[in-house]
């Protein structure tokens, strides 16, 4: 990683350079997330395009006679390929994504392409029961902007409460406690805030004013710390 400083000392043309992480066939040998970010910043600091590898669950061929995946990040080894791509996008240090193993099937190639080329990173939400039509529209049909004056308890997108002001959002699934990763829409009993989309960061009591409509998948719950204030993201509805 120190070689990049020596290379840059010669004033190379940046459009002839690409920084690329390694892939790691052996389980438990991939980069940790913090080290990955630190190494990537060396390239970013010089304005060098940077690439990393994901692994295709459908593929089993690599450079060595082992089939334990070929990711750059150890935390990506057992993720779905779409979640791996969104993970790399959320780090904001990677320009290009490569599939390390062969031969990925059509489904994995399509999932990786959709994740890479979609306008914003997306997190998947499991809905135990169907949300109302308006709640589904709020949560899944539009991009969300993480409000900049951020709370320790909630990620807030306040724009839906403006767009859908005055529309009915009756109470349902609004009791007990909310857990990290729960996705809620503020209901009509909280008039000023009705329609606001929120993702729970810390456990808190539900006082009846927030309708729980789903929960982040286990895979994507681990990506929650990478969401930053003032960033735009999307939510995707999935079933169990």
What are these model-predicted stretches?
Residues 2-129:
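Catalytic alpha/beta core domains of metabolic enzymes, predominantly
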Residues 128-240:
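C-terminal functional modules
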